[in-house]
Amino acid sequence: MKIKFAIKNLFMETKFEVGDKVSWNSEAGRVSGTIIKIHRQDFNHKGYRHHASKEEPQYEIKSNKTDHIAAHKGSALTKL
């Protein structure tokens, strides 16, 4: 049972909150920003349909450098 619990925890995503400082990889390299919104239902962003749920939310993040708004799953983010 301990092994099963350890494996489950290994793959659990970190939960983030509005205002958290995070970073992620982009085509231009590592980017950092602040979470401004959390989506727990499917939503449209910049012409694309993003899938989100209570179990796997997506986050809107405002870039510190460019003010660009990006949408990512928690698995793509690193808390700063």
Where are the model-predicted features located?
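Short, Lys/Arg-enriched N-terminal segments with co-localized hydrophobic residues
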Residues: 1-11
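Basic/aromatic-rich interaction segments and small domains that mediate binding to polyanionic partners
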Residues: 13-75, 80
